[in-house]
Amino acid sequence: MSTNPKPQRKTKRNTNRRPQDVKFPGGGQIVGGVYLLPRRGPRLGVRATRKTSERSQPRGRRQPIPKARRPEGRAWAQPGYPWPLYGNEGLGWAGWLLSPRGSRPSWGPTDPRRRSRNLGKVIDTLTCGFADLMGYIPLVGAPLGGAARALAHGVRVLEDSVNYATGNLPGCSFSIFLLALLSCLTIPASAYEVRNVSGVYHVTNDCSNSSIVYEAADLIMHAPGCVPCVRENNSSRCWVALTPTLAARNTSIPTTTIRRHVDLLVGAATFCSAMYVGDLCGSVFLVSQLFTFSPRRHETLQDCNCSIYPGHLSGHRMAWDMMMNWSPTTALVVSQLLRIPQTVVDMVTGAHWGVLAGLAYYSMVGNWAKVLIVMLLFAGVDGTTHVTGGATGHTTSGIASLFLPGASQKIQLINTNGSWHINRTALNCNDSLNTGFLAALFYTHKFNASGCPERLASCRSIDGFDQGWGPITYTEPGDSDQKPYCWHYAPQRCSVVSAADVCGPVYCFTPSP
Protein backbone atom coordinates (compact mmCIF):
# COMPACT_ATOMS: atom_id res chain seq x y z
CA MET A 1 0.00 0.00 0.00
CA SER A 2 1.48 3.27 -1.17
CA THR A 3 1.99 6.16 1.19
CA ASN A 4 1.98 8.82 -1.56
CA PRO A 5 -0.96 11.20 -1.41
CA LYS A 6 -3.68 10.78 -3.93
CA PRO A 7 -3.31 13.23 -6.84
CA GLN A 8 -6.09 15.76 -6.97
CA ARG A 9 -7.70 17.16 -10.12
CA LYS A 10 -7.07 20.85 -10.67
CA THR A 11 -10.19 22.93 -10.47
CA LYS A 12 -10.92 26.63 -10.73
CA ARG A 13 -10.75 26.91 -6.96
CA ASN A 14 -7.25 25.64 -6.36
CA THR A 15 -5.59 27.03 -9.53
CA ASN A 16 -3.35 30.13 -9.17
CA ARG A 17 -4.58 32.27 -12.02
CA ARG A 18 -3.79 35.90 -12.91
CA PRO A 19 -6.63 38.35 -12.49
CA GLN A 20 -8.20 39.28 -15.80
CA ASP A 21 -8.15 42.88 -17.09
CA VAL A 22 -11.54 44.51 -16.95
CA LYS A 23 -12.57 47.43 -19.18
CA PHE A 24 -15.48 49.69 -18.40
CA PRO A 25 -17.64 51.52 -20.98
CA GLY A 26 -16.57 54.89 -19.62
CA GLY A 27 -12.98 54.29 -20.63
CA GLY A 28 -11.59 53.17 -17.26
CA GLN A 29 -10.02 49.76 -16.82
CA ILE A 30 -8.52 47.46 -14.20
CA VAL A 31 -5.02 46.32 -15.05
CA GLY A 32 -3.23 44.03 -12.59
CA GLY A 33 -5.73 44.80 -9.91
CA VAL A 34 -5.23 48.57 -10.28
CA TYR A 35 -7.99 50.82 -11.56
CA LEU A 36 -6.82 53.27 -14.23
CA LEU A 37 -8.73 56.44 -14.98
CA PRO A 38 -10.01 56.98 -18.52
CA ARG A 39 -7.67 58.79 -20.88
CA ARG A 40 -8.64 62.40 -21.44
CA GLY A 41 -8.23 64.46 -24.60
CA PRO A 42 -8.74 63.59 -28.26
CA ARG A 43 -7.93 60.02 -29.15
CA LEU A 44 -5.87 59.78 -32.31
CA GLY A 45 -6.90 56.21 -33.06
CA VAL A 46 -9.19 53.47 -31.74
CA ARG A 47 -8.37 49.81 -32.11
CA ALA A 48 -11.40 47.69 -32.83
CA THR A 49 -12.24 45.08 -30.17
CA ARG A 50 -12.43 41.58 -31.58
CA LYS A 51 -15.69 39.73 -31.31
CA THR A 52 -15.98 36.45 -29.44
CA SER A 53 -16.48 34.56 -32.68
CA GLU A 54 -13.32 36.11 -34.16
CA ARG A 55 -10.96 35.21 -31.32
CA SER A 56 -10.23 31.77 -32.75
CA GLN A 57 -9.31 33.24 -36.14
CA PRO A 58 -5.75 34.40 -36.92
CA ARG A 59 -5.16 38.02 -36.08
CA GLY A 60 -4.80 40.26 -39.15
CA ARG A 61 -2.29 43.04 -39.62
CA ARG A 62 -2.95 45.85 -37.19
CA GLN A 63 -3.48 49.27 -38.72
CA PRO A 64 -1.07 51.92 -37.38
CA ILE A 65 -2.47 54.75 -35.30
CA PRO A 66 -2.57 57.88 -37.45
CA LYS A 67 -0.29 60.68 -36.27
CA ALA A 68 -1.42 64.22 -35.68
CA ARG A 69 -1.06 66.26 -38.84
CA ARG A 70 0.91 69.46 -38.80
CA PRO A 71 -1.55 72.34 -39.04
CA GLU A 72 -1.60 73.97 -42.44
CA GLY A 73 -2.23 77.60 -43.28
CA ARG A 74 -0.92 80.60 -41.41
CA ALA A 75 1.69 79.54 -38.90
CA TRP A 76 2.53 82.92 -37.41
CA ALA A 77 5.83 83.40 -35.55
CA GLN A 78 7.19 80.00 -36.61
CA PRO A 79 10.32 79.34 -38.69
CA GLY A 80 9.39 78.80 -42.27
CA TYR A 81 6.01 80.48 -42.06
CA PRO A 82 4.25 81.15 -45.35
CA TRP A 83 3.64 84.76 -46.25
CA PRO A 84 0.16 86.03 -45.40
CA LEU A 85 -2.36 87.60 -47.75
CA TYR A 86 -1.92 84.74 -50.24
CA GLY A 87 1.73 85.63 -50.74
CA ASN A 88 2.83 81.99 -50.64
CA GLU A 89 0.11 80.88 -53.05
CA GLY A 90 0.69 83.84 -55.34
CA LEU A 91 4.38 83.07 -55.70
CA GLY A 92 3.49 79.45 -56.38
CA TRP A 93 1.29 80.52 -59.29
CA ALA A 94 3.99 82.92 -60.45
CA GLY A 95 6.51 80.10 -60.54
CA TRP A 96 4.04 77.92 -62.45
CA LEU A 97 3.49 80.65 -65.04
CA LEU A 98 7.22 81.34 -65.41
CA SER A 99 8.09 77.67 -65.82
CA PRO A 100 8.35 76.25 -69.36
CA ARG A 101 5.74 73.87 -70.67
CA GLY A 102 8.12 70.96 -70.42
CA SER A 103 8.48 71.23 -66.65
CA ARG A 104 5.09 69.72 -65.83
CA PRO A 105 6.26 66.14 -65.16
CA SER A 106 6.78 65.32 -61.49
CA TRP A 107 10.11 64.30 -60.05
CA GLY A 108 8.63 62.02 -57.42
CA PRO A 109 9.05 62.40 -53.66
CA THR A 110 12.47 64.08 -54.11
CA ASP A 111 11.03 66.98 -56.10
CA PRO A 112 12.65 70.20 -54.78
CA ARG A 113 9.40 72.03 -55.43
CA ARG A 114 7.71 70.01 -52.67
CA ARG A 115 9.87 71.61 -49.97
CA SER A 116 9.97 75.16 -51.33
CA ARG A 117 8.01 78.11 -50.02
CA ASN A 118 7.68 81.80 -50.78
CA LEU A 119 10.56 82.90 -53.06
CA GLY A 120 11.85 79.33 -53.13
CA LYS A 121 8.85 78.37 -55.24
CA VAL A 122 10.01 80.65 -58.05
CA ILE A 123 13.66 79.58 -57.78
CA ASP A 124 12.96 75.84 -57.67
CA THR A 125 10.39 76.02 -60.45
CA LEU A 126 12.88 77.75 -62.74
CA THR A 127 15.72 75.33 -61.93
CA CYS A 128 13.52 72.26 -62.33
CA GLY A 129 11.99 73.62 -65.53
CA PHE A 130 15.45 74.26 -66.93
CA ALA A 131 16.41 70.66 -66.09
CA ASP A 132 13.31 69.32 -67.85
CA LEU A 133 14.05 71.37 -70.96
CA MET A 134 17.63 70.09 -71.02
CA GLY A 135 16.26 66.55 -70.93
CA TYR A 136 14.24 67.12 -74.11
CA ILE A 137 17.30 67.95 -76.24
CA PRO A 138 17.96 65.11 -78.72
CA LEU A 139 21.09 62.95 -78.32
CA VAL A 140 22.57 64.93 -75.41
CA GLY A 141 19.36 65.26 -73.39
CA ALA A 142 20.19 62.45 -70.94
CA PRO A 143 23.55 63.78 -69.68
CA LEU A 144 22.47 67.43 -69.79
CA GLY A 145 19.18 66.68 -68.05
CA GLY A 146 20.95 64.70 -65.32
CA ALA A 147 23.45 67.49 -64.74
CA ALA A 148 20.66 70.08 -64.65
CA ARG A 149 18.71 67.95 -62.16
CA ALA A 150 21.77 67.66 -59.95
CA LEU A 151 22.13 71.45 -60.15
CA ALA A 152 18.49 71.91 -59.13
CA HIS A 153 18.96 69.60 -56.14
CA GLY A 154 22.13 71.48 -55.20
CA VAL A 155 20.24 74.79 -55.26
CA ARG A 156 17.57 73.23 -53.04
CA VAL A 157 20.20 71.98 -50.57
CA LEU A 158 21.69 75.48 -50.49
CA GLU A 159 18.25 76.98 -49.80
CA ASP A 160 17.63 74.47 -47.01
CA SER A 161 21.00 75.32 -45.47
CA VAL A 162 20.24 79.04 -45.57
CA ASN A 163 16.78 78.46 -44.11
CA TYR A 164 18.22 76.35 -41.29
CA ALA A 165 21.01 78.78 -40.51
CA THR A 166 18.74 81.82 -40.55
CA GLY A 167 15.93 80.23 -38.57
CA ASN A 168 17.56 78.02 -35.94
CA LEU A 169 20.67 79.85 -34.75
CA PRO A 170 19.88 81.64 -31.46
CA GLY A 171 19.84 85.39 -31.84
CA CYS A 172 20.58 85.22 -35.57
CA SER A 173 17.18 84.80 -37.19
CA PHE A 174 18.17 86.71 -40.30
CA SER A 175 15.75 87.54 -43.04
CA ILE A 176 15.90 89.18 -46.42
CA PHE A 177 15.12 92.50 -44.76
CA LEU A 178 18.14 92.17 -42.48
CA LEU A 179 20.28 91.34 -45.49
CA ALA A 180 18.91 94.48 -47.12
CA LEU A 181 20.01 96.51 -44.10
CA LEU A 182 23.42 94.88 -44.31
CA SER A 183 23.66 95.99 -47.92
CA CYS A 184 23.67 99.59 -46.67
CA LEU A 185 26.80 98.91 -44.62
CA THR A 186 28.74 96.41 -46.71
CA ILE A 187 29.31 98.64 -49.70
CA PRO A 188 32.66 98.01 -51.42
CA ALA A 189 34.96 99.80 -49.00
CA SER A 190 38.09 98.20 -50.43
CA ALA A 191 37.76 99.97 -53.78
CA TYR A 192 39.93 103.00 -54.46
CA GLU A 193 38.91 106.03 -56.50
CA VAL A 194 40.52 106.59 -59.90
CA ARG A 195 40.32 109.79 -61.98
CA ASN A 196 40.77 109.67 -65.75
CA VAL A 197 42.48 112.74 -67.22
CA SER A 198 43.28 112.54 -70.93
CA GLY A 199 43.72 108.78 -70.75
CA VAL A 200 45.95 108.92 -67.65
CA TYR A 201 44.48 107.44 -64.46
CA HIS A 202 45.26 109.08 -61.11
CA VAL A 203 44.53 107.59 -57.70
CA THR A 204 42.65 110.18 -55.65
CA ASN A 205 40.65 110.55 -52.47
CA ASP A 206 37.77 112.35 -54.21
CA CYS A 207 34.53 110.39 -54.47
CA SER A 208 33.35 109.47 -57.93
CA ASN A 209 29.71 109.72 -58.97
CA SER A 210 29.27 105.97 -58.52
CA SER A 211 30.37 106.28 -54.86
CA ILE A 212 27.60 108.76 -53.98
CA VAL A 213 24.76 106.94 -52.20
CA TYR A 214 22.43 109.77 -51.12
CA GLU A 215 22.45 113.56 -51.39
CA ALA A 216 20.70 116.05 -49.14
CA ALA A 217 20.81 119.83 -49.09
CA ASP A 218 23.95 119.99 -46.93
CA LEU A 219 24.89 116.32 -46.53
CA ILE A 220 26.21 113.59 -48.81
CA MET A 221 26.25 109.89 -47.94
CA HIS A 222 29.00 108.12 -49.84
CA ALA A 223 31.09 104.96 -49.88
CA PRO A 224 33.81 104.75 -47.22
CA GLY A 225 37.36 105.56 -48.22
CA CYS A 226 36.72 108.84 -50.07
CA VAL A 227 35.64 112.47 -49.54
CA PRO A 228 33.21 114.36 -51.82
CA CYS A 229 34.65 117.21 -53.87
CA VAL A 230 31.76 119.58 -54.69
CA ARG A 231 31.89 122.43 -57.19
CA GLU A 232 30.17 125.56 -55.91
CA ASN A 233 30.42 129.13 -57.24
CA ASN A 234 32.87 128.13 -59.98
CA SER A 235 35.29 126.58 -57.48
CA SER A 236 35.83 123.06 -56.19
CA ARG A 237 35.94 122.49 -52.46
CA CYS A 238 36.29 119.44 -50.26
CA TRP A 239 33.45 118.78 -47.86
CA VAL A 240 34.08 117.92 -44.22
CA ALA A 241 34.01 114.19 -43.44
CA LEU A 242 31.78 113.73 -40.40
CA THR A 243 31.87 109.94 -40.51
CA PRO A 244 33.53 107.44 -42.87
CA THR A 245 30.30 107.44 -44.92
CA LEU A 246 28.88 110.94 -44.33
CA ALA A 247 30.22 114.36 -45.38
CA ALA A 248 28.78 117.83 -44.79
CA ARG A 249 29.28 121.29 -46.20
CA ASN A 250 30.83 122.37 -42.88
CA THR A 251 31.02 121.13 -39.31
CA SER A 252 28.00 123.17 -38.18
CA ILE A 253 25.55 121.15 -40.31
CA PRO A 254 23.40 118.90 -38.09
CA THR A 255 22.81 115.28 -39.02
CA THR A 256 19.15 115.34 -37.99
CA THR A 257 17.83 114.81 -41.52
CA ILE A 258 19.88 111.67 -42.09
CA ARG A 259 19.00 110.34 -38.66
CA ARG A 260 15.30 110.73 -39.41
CA HIS A 261 15.78 108.54 -42.47
CA VAL A 262 17.37 105.88 -40.27
CA ASP A 263 14.48 106.29 -37.82
CA LEU A 264 11.99 105.62 -40.59
CA LEU A 265 14.01 102.70 -41.93
CA VAL A 266 14.36 100.93 -38.58
CA GLY A 267 10.73 101.63 -37.70
CA ALA A 268 9.61 100.02 -40.96
CA ALA A 269 11.88 97.04 -40.28
CA THR A 270 10.39 96.60 -36.82
CA PHE A 271 6.83 96.78 -38.14
CA CYS A 272 7.57 94.23 -40.86
CA SER A 273 9.22 91.89 -38.35
CA ALA A 274 6.32 92.22 -35.91
CA MET A 275 3.83 91.40 -38.69
CA TYR A 276 6.05 88.52 -39.91
CA VAL A 277 6.36 89.95 -43.42
CA GLY A 278 10.04 90.85 -43.16
CA ASP A 279 10.97 88.81 -46.23
CA LEU A 280 8.35 90.59 -48.33
CA CYS A 281 9.47 94.03 -47.13
CA GLY A 282 13.10 93.09 -47.70
CA SER A 283 12.39 92.00 -51.24
CA VAL A 284 10.71 95.32 -51.99
CA PHE A 285 13.63 97.18 -50.41
CA LEU A 286 16.23 95.27 -52.42
CA VAL A 287 14.36 95.89 -55.66
CA SER A 288 13.96 99.59 -54.81
CA GLN A 289 17.74 99.93 -54.44
CA LEU A 290 18.03 99.46 -58.19
CA PHE A 291 16.35 102.82 -58.76
CA THR A 292 17.29 106.38 -57.84
CA PHE A 293 15.20 107.89 -55.05
CA SER A 294 16.18 111.54 -55.52
CA PRO A 295 17.88 113.53 -58.31
CA ARG A 296 21.43 114.83 -58.02
CA ARG A 297 21.68 118.06 -56.02
CA HIS A 298 25.42 118.70 -56.17
CA GLU A 299 28.09 118.56 -58.83
CA THR A 300 30.81 116.23 -57.58
CA LEU A 301 34.22 116.33 -59.23
CA GLN A 302 37.61 114.71 -58.68
CA ASP A 303 40.04 117.63 -58.94
CA CYS A 304 40.37 118.57 -55.23
CA ASN A 305 42.64 115.79 -53.96
CA CYS A 306 40.84 115.88 -50.61
CA SER A 307 42.21 114.42 -47.42
CA ILE A 308 40.28 111.62 -45.77
CA TYR A 309 40.59 113.24 -42.35
CA PRO A 310 40.55 116.92 -41.35
CA GLY A 311 42.74 118.57 -38.76
CA HIS A 312 46.39 118.43 -37.79
CA LEU A 313 48.43 115.50 -39.13
CA SER A 314 50.80 113.83 -36.71
CA GLY A 315 53.18 110.99 -37.41
CA HIS A 316 51.25 108.57 -35.23
CA ARG A 317 47.96 109.51 -36.85
CA MET A 318 49.44 109.17 -40.31
CA ALA A 319 50.86 105.72 -39.56
CA TRP A 320 47.59 104.61 -37.93
CA ASP A 321 45.51 105.68 -40.90
CA MET A 322 47.87 104.04 -43.37
CA MET A 323 47.57 100.81 -41.39
CA MET A 324 43.79 101.07 -41.18
CA ASN A 325 43.52 101.77 -44.90
CA TRP A 326 44.92 98.34 -45.59
CA SER A 327 41.53 97.06 -44.42
CA PRO A 328 38.95 99.86 -44.87
CA THR A 329 36.04 97.62 -43.90
CA THR A 330 37.70 96.89 -40.56
CA ALA A 331 38.31 100.60 -40.08
CA LEU A 332 34.63 101.31 -40.79
CA VAL A 333 33.37 98.68 -38.32
CA VAL A 334 35.82 99.69 -35.58
CA SER A 335 34.97 103.36 -36.05
CA GLN A 336 31.26 102.63 -35.67
CA LEU A 337 31.74 100.34 -32.67
CA LEU A 338 33.68 103.04 -30.82
CA ARG A 339 30.79 105.48 -31.33
CA ILE A 340 28.09 103.20 -29.89
CA PRO A 341 28.20 104.64 -26.31
CA GLN A 342 27.64 108.17 -27.59
CA THR A 343 25.06 106.82 -30.02
CA VAL A 344 22.96 105.41 -27.16
CA VAL A 345 22.88 108.82 -25.50
CA ASP A 346 21.90 110.50 -28.79
CA MET A 347 19.03 108.03 -29.27
CA VAL A 348 17.43 109.00 -25.97
CA THR A 349 18.12 112.74 -26.10
CA GLY A 350 17.14 113.02 -29.76
CA ALA A 351 13.85 111.10 -29.32
CA HIS A 352 14.56 108.60 -32.11
CA TRP A 353 11.50 106.48 -31.43
CA GLY A 354 11.87 104.29 -34.50
CA VAL A 355 15.34 103.15 -33.48
CA LEU A 356 14.33 102.76 -29.83
CA ALA A 357 11.28 100.69 -30.79
CA GLY A 358 13.42 98.49 -33.02
CA LEU A 359 16.00 97.92 -30.30
CA ALA A 360 13.30 97.14 -27.73
CA TYR A 361 11.48 94.69 -30.02
CA TYR A 362 14.58 92.85 -31.21
CA SER A 363 15.89 92.64 -27.64
CA MET A 364 12.63 91.13 -26.37
CA VAL A 365 12.58 88.44 -29.07
CA GLY A 366 16.28 87.70 -28.60
CA ASN A 367 17.51 88.83 -32.03
CA TRP A 368 20.80 90.25 -30.79
CA ALA A 369 22.28 90.25 -34.28
CA LYS A 370 19.59 92.70 -35.40
CA VAL A 371 20.23 94.83 -32.32
CA LEU A 372 23.90 95.12 -33.29
CA ILE A 373 23.04 95.91 -36.92
CA VAL A 374 20.63 98.69 -35.88
CA MET A 375 23.26 100.16 -33.55
CA LEU A 376 25.88 100.16 -36.31
CA LEU A 377 23.40 101.63 -38.78
CA PHE A 378 22.58 104.51 -36.45
CA ALA A 379 26.23 105.01 -35.50
CA GLY A 380 27.07 105.33 -39.19
CA VAL A 381 25.30 108.70 -39.30
CA ASP A 382 26.60 109.98 -35.97
CA GLY A 383 27.68 113.58 -36.45
CA THR A 384 31.14 114.13 -34.99
CA THR A 385 34.40 115.27 -36.46
CA HIS A 386 36.61 112.72 -34.66
CA VAL A 387 35.44 109.54 -36.30
CA THR A 388 38.34 108.06 -38.23
CA GLY A 389 40.63 105.39 -36.94
CA GLY A 390 43.42 107.95 -36.84
CA ALA A 391 41.51 110.18 -34.40
CA THR A 392 40.83 107.19 -32.18
CA GLY A 393 44.44 106.14 -32.32
CA HIS A 394 45.56 109.70 -31.61
CA THR A 395 43.35 109.85 -28.52
CA THR A 396 44.58 106.46 -27.34
CA SER A 397 48.19 107.48 -27.81
CA GLY A 398 47.55 110.70 -25.87
CA ILE A 399 46.20 108.75 -22.90
CA ALA A 400 48.99 106.19 -23.09
CA SER A 401 51.63 108.92 -23.24
CA LEU A 402 50.77 109.90 -19.66
CA PHE A 403 52.32 106.66 -18.43
CA LEU A 404 55.41 106.64 -20.63
CA PRO A 405 58.60 107.06 -18.62
CA GLY A 406 60.17 109.11 -21.40
CA ALA A 407 63.85 109.74 -21.99
CA SER A 408 66.14 109.51 -19.00
CA GLN A 409 69.19 111.19 -20.51
CA LYS A 410 70.15 114.74 -19.60
CA ILE A 411 68.67 117.27 -22.00
CA GLN A 412 71.03 120.13 -22.85
CA LEU A 413 69.82 123.17 -24.81
CA ILE A 414 72.35 125.11 -26.88
CA ASN A 415 71.70 128.65 -28.10
CA THR A 416 73.50 129.26 -31.38
CA ASN A 417 72.84 132.37 -33.47
CA GLY A 418 69.48 132.91 -31.78
CA SER A 419 68.26 129.36 -32.46
CA TRP A 420 67.92 126.60 -29.90
CA HIS A 421 69.35 123.17 -30.73
CA ILE A 422 69.47 119.75 -29.10
CA ASN A 423 71.65 117.17 -30.81
CA ARG A 424 71.74 119.36 -33.95
CA THR A 425 67.90 119.38 -34.13
CA ALA A 426 66.04 122.69 -33.89
CA LEU A 427 63.68 122.69 -30.94
CA ASN A 428 61.69 125.21 -28.95
CA CYS A 429 61.68 125.40 -25.19
CA ASN A 430 58.29 123.82 -24.55
CA ASP A 431 58.85 120.75 -26.74
CA SER A 432 61.83 119.67 -24.66
CA LEU A 433 59.48 118.56 -21.87
CA ASN A 434 57.13 116.73 -24.24
CA THR A 435 58.51 113.32 -23.24
CA GLY A 436 55.68 112.05 -21.09
CA PHE A 437 53.95 113.00 -17.86
CA LEU A 438 56.14 110.78 -15.69
CA ALA A 439 59.28 112.17 -17.30
CA ALA A 440 58.19 115.67 -16.34
CA LEU A 441 57.84 114.51 -12.72
CA PHE A 442 61.05 112.52 -12.29
CA TYR A 443 63.45 114.05 -14.82
CA THR A 444 62.90 117.79 -14.43
CA HIS A 445 65.97 118.10 -12.26
CA LYS A 446 68.04 116.78 -15.16
CA PHE A 447 66.71 119.38 -17.58
CA ASN A 448 68.94 122.37 -18.22
CA ALA A 449 66.61 125.26 -19.05
CA SER A 450 69.28 127.91 -19.25
CA GLY A 451 68.32 130.48 -21.84
CA CYS A 452 64.58 129.80 -21.78
CA PRO A 453 63.72 132.66 -19.39
CA GLU A 454 65.54 135.10 -21.66
CA ARG A 455 63.64 133.87 -24.70
CA LEU A 456 60.26 133.89 -22.93
CA ALA A 457 60.85 137.36 -21.51
CA SER A 458 59.86 138.90 -24.83
CA CYS A 459 56.38 137.33 -24.64
CA ARG A 460 53.61 139.58 -23.38
CA SER A 461 51.19 138.86 -20.57
CA ILE A 462 47.42 138.86 -20.96
CA ASP A 463 47.05 142.43 -19.70
CA GLY A 464 49.21 143.64 -22.57
CA PHE A 465 46.39 143.11 -25.08
CA ASP A 466 43.32 145.21 -25.74
CA GLN A 467 39.89 143.83 -24.95
CA GLY A 468 38.27 142.49 -28.08
CA TRP A 469 34.67 142.47 -29.25
CA GLY A 470 32.63 141.12 -32.11
CA PRO A 471 32.88 137.72 -33.80
CA ILE A 472 36.07 135.69 -33.62
CA THR A 473 38.15 136.09 -36.78
CA TYR A 474 41.59 135.16 -37.98
CA THR A 475 44.51 137.48 -37.24
CA GLU A 476 47.80 137.81 -39.03
CA PRO A 477 50.84 137.86 -36.70
CA GLY A 478 52.84 140.93 -37.63
CA ASP A 479 54.56 142.06 -34.43
CA SER A 480 58.12 141.12 -33.72
CA ASP A 481 57.18 139.56 -30.37
CA GLN A 482 54.87 137.03 -32.02
CA LYS A 483 57.16 134.03 -31.63
CA PRO A 484 56.09 130.38 -31.94
CA TYR A 485 57.12 129.67 -28.34
CA CYS A 486 54.87 132.41 -26.93
CA TRP A 487 51.43 131.51 -25.61
CA HIS A 488 49.77 134.28 -27.63
CA TYR A 489 51.27 133.21 -30.95
CA ALA A 490 48.56 133.07 -33.64
CA PRO A 491 49.43 130.64 -36.42
CA GLN A 492 48.89 131.72 -39.98
CA ARG A 493 45.79 130.65 -41.84
CA CYS A 494 46.00 127.42 -43.79
CA SER A 495 45.75 127.85 -47.52
CA VAL A 496 44.69 125.39 -50.19
CA VAL A 497 47.54 124.40 -52.49
CA SER A 498 46.81 122.57 -55.70
CA ALA A 499 48.51 119.21 -56.07
CA ALA A 500 49.95 120.34 -59.42
CA ASP A 501 51.97 123.06 -57.67
CA VAL A 502 53.54 120.73 -55.09
CA CYS A 503 57.16 119.84 -55.75
CA GLY A 504 57.75 116.23 -54.84
CA PRO A 505 55.62 113.12 -54.41
CA VAL A 506 51.98 113.48 -53.39
CA TYR A 507 51.00 110.93 -50.75
CA CYS A 508 47.50 109.52 -51.12
CA PHE A 509 46.01 107.96 -48.01
CA THR A 510 43.58 105.78 -49.90
CA PRO A 511 43.42 101.98 -49.80
CA SER A 512 46.37 100.41 -51.55
CA PRO A 513 45.55 99.11 -55.05
From Swiss-Prot:
Residues 2-23 are annotated as: Interaction with STAT1. The keyword Kinase does not apply. Residues 2-168 are cytoplasmic. The modification N-acetylserine is found at S2. Residues 32-47 have a biased composition (Low complexity). Residues 164-167 are annotated as: Important for lipid droplets localization. GO terms for biological process: clathrin-dependent endocytosis of virus by host cell; fusion of virus membrane with host endosome membrane; symbiont-mediated suppression of host innate immune response; virion attachment to host cell. Residues 474-479 are annotated as: HVR2. Residues 2-75 are annotated as: Disordered. Residues 178-191 form a propeptide. This is Genome polyprotein. It comes from Hepatitis C virus (isolate HC-J2) (HCV).
